[in-house]
C-alpha cells in the first residue's frame, strides 16, 4: 500500500493507497483487473491538442492554492486545456475521493469517514472571484459517509459564492443524496440558478455502468422533485454515448427526461479513462450528434448541447446564452 506524502508519488491506476487525511482509497475508482480486450482506434475528431496558456496556468495555480479539486483533473476530462485556457473550471467539492464506484468514472473511490474541509466553501468563493467567473459550475463526489450526503456543505458553498456576488450564476451538478428530499431541499433553498444530475446512460445499461446505489429512475425522480418544488430553477441532465446503447434508447431517455420537466440535456462521447474501465463500444460521428440535437430540440428541451467532446459542464455558460435564458 502506497502513501501520499509531501513528495509526490505516482500511484498506479487500480491500486489502493492512503490519502493525506488517513483513509484508504482506490486510484481511478476501479480495482486492478484484466485489461479489456476490446480496443477501438480513436477517430481524428476526438484528438485534442494540448495548450498550456497563461490562463490555464492561472486556473491551475488558483485551485492548488485554495486546496480545491476539479472534476476536470480528477475525471480526466478531454476538454481541460480548452476550458482552463478560457479561464473556466468545474470545481469538485468535498474532496477527490468518492464513496461510489461507477464503472465509467476515473475519480478515486474510498470511504472518507466523515472528513470535510470546513474552509472549502469560502475558499471556493474566493477562487471564483480570482478567476473572474460570471458563471460557475460546482460538482462533487458522492459522500454516502455523511449523514446528509454533504448537502449542507454543498449549500454553504453556493451561499458563499452568492454572498460574494449575487450576480454570479451558479450551476450545481449534485449527487442524488440517496433520494432524501430534506437533503435536496438544502440545495433548492439556496439562490442556485441551475440544478443538474446526470442520468449517464440509458435505462438498460444503468446497472452495468453506474454504482448500484445510483438508479435511472432515482435520478429522474430527483429532477422531477426539483422542478416541482422550484419551477424557476433550470434542470439539466447528461448522457454518455458509446457504451452499447441504441439511438432508439437514447431518444427514449430524452422522452423520460422531458416527462419530469428537464430543461437542458447534453450528449457526449464516452471515452475509456483507463484500461480497467468499461471499453468503448462505438464512436458516434459528429453528424449523428447533430441529429441528436435536432431531435432533442423537437422534443421540447430549451437547449441540447450535443457533440463528441461535450460533457455536462462543457461551455455551460454559452449553452444558456444561445437561447437567451438570462443566464
Swiss-Prot record:
Keywords: 4Fe-4S, Cytoplasm, Iron, Iron-sulfur, Metal-binding, S-adenosyl-L-methionine, Transferase. NCBIfam families: lipA, PRK05481.1, PRK12928.1. GO terms for cellular component: cytoplasm. Its cofactor is [4Fe-4S] cluster. [4Fe-4S] cluster 1 binds at residues 72, 77, 83, 313. Its EC number is 2.8.1.8. Coiled coil: none annotated. Residues 83-302 form the Radical SAM core domain. This is Lipoyl synthase. InterPro entries: Aldolase_TIM, Elp3/MiaA/NifB-like_rSAM, LIAS_N, Lipoyl_synth, rSAM. It comes from the Bacteria. [4Fe-4S] cluster 2 binds at residues 98, 102, 105. The gene is lipA. HAMAP family: Lipoyl_synth. It catalyses: [[Fe-S] cluster scaffold protein carrying a second [4Fe-4S](2+) cluster] + N(6)-octanoyl-L-lysyl-[protein] + 2 oxidized [2Fe-2S]-[ferredoxin] + 2 S-adenosyl-L-methionine + 4 H(+) = [[Fe-S] cluster scaffold protein] + N(6)-[(R)-dihydrolipoyl]-L-lysyl-[protein] + 4 Fe(3+) + 2 hydrogen sulfide + 2 5'-deoxyadenosine + 2 L-methionine + 2 reduced [2Fe-2S]-[ferredoxin]. SMART domains: Elp3 (SM00729). Binds 2 [4Fe-4S] clusters per subunit. One cluster is coordinated with 3 cysteines and an exchangeable S-adenosyl-L-methionine. Pathway: Protein modification; protein lipoylation via endogenous pathway; protein N(6)-(lipoyl)lysine from octanoyl-[acyl-carrier-protein]: step 2/2. Belongs to the radical SAM superfamily. Lipoyl synthase family. It holds the Pfam family Radical_SAM. One of its GO terms (molecular function) is metal ion binding. It is found in: Cytoplasm.
Amino acid at each position: 500500500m502506497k502513501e501520499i506524502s509531501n513528495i509526490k508519488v505516482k500511484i498506479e491506476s487500480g491500486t489502493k493507497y492512503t490519502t493525506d487525511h488517513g483513509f484508504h482509497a482506490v486510484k481511478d475508482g476501479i480495482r486492478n483487473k484484466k485489461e479489456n480486450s476490446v480496443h477501438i482506434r480513436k477517430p481524428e475528431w476526438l484528438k485534442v491538442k494540448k495548450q498550456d496558456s497563461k490562463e490555464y496556468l492561472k486556473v491551475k495555480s488558483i485551485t492548488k492554492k485554495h486546496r480545491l479539486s476539479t472534476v476536470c483533473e480528477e475525471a480526466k476530462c478531454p476538454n481541460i486545456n480548452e476550458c482552463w485556457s478560457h479561464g473556466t473550471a468545474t470545481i469538485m467539492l468535498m474532496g477527490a475521493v468518492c464513496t461510489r464506484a461507477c464503472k465509467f468514472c476515473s475519480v478515486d473511490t474510498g470511504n472518507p469517514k466523515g472528513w470535510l474541509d470546513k474552509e472549502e466553501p469560502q475558499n471556493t468563493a474566493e477562487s471564483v472571484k480570482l478567476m473572474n467567473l460570471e458563471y460557475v459550475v460546482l460538482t462533487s463526489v458522492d459522500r454516502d459517509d455523511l449523514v446528509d450526503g454533504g448537502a449542507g456543505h454543498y449549500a454553504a458553498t453556493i451561499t458563499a459564492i452568492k454572498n460574494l456576488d449575487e450576480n454570479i450564476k451558479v450551476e450545481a451538478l449534485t449527487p442524488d443524496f440517496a433520494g432524501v428530499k430534506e437533503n435536496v431541499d438544502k440545495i433548492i433553498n439556496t439562490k442556485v440558478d441551475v440544478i443538474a444530475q446526470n442520468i449517464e446512460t440509458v435505462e438498460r445499461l444503468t446497472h452495468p455502468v453506474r454504482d448500484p446505489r445510483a438508479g435511472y429512475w432515482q435520478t429522474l425522480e430527483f429532477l422531477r422533485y426539483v422542478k416541482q418544488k422550484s419551477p424557476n430553477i433550470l434542470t439539466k441532465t447528461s448522457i454518455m454515448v458509446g457504451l452499447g446503447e441504441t439511438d432508439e434508447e437514447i431518444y427514449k431517455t430524452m422522452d423520460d427526461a422531458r416527462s419530469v420537466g428537464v430543461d437542458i440535456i447534453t450528449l457526449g462521447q464516452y471515452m475509456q479513462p483507463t484500461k480497467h474501465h468499461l471499453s468503448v463500444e462505438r464512436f458516434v460521428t459528429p453528424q449523428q450528434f447533430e441529429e441528436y440535437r435536432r431531435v432533442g430540440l423537437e422534443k421540447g428541451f430549451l437547449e441540447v448541447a450535443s457533440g463528441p467532446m461535450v460533457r455536462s459542464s462543457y461551455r455551460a455558460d454559452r449553452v444558456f446564452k444561445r437561447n437567451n435564458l438570462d443566464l
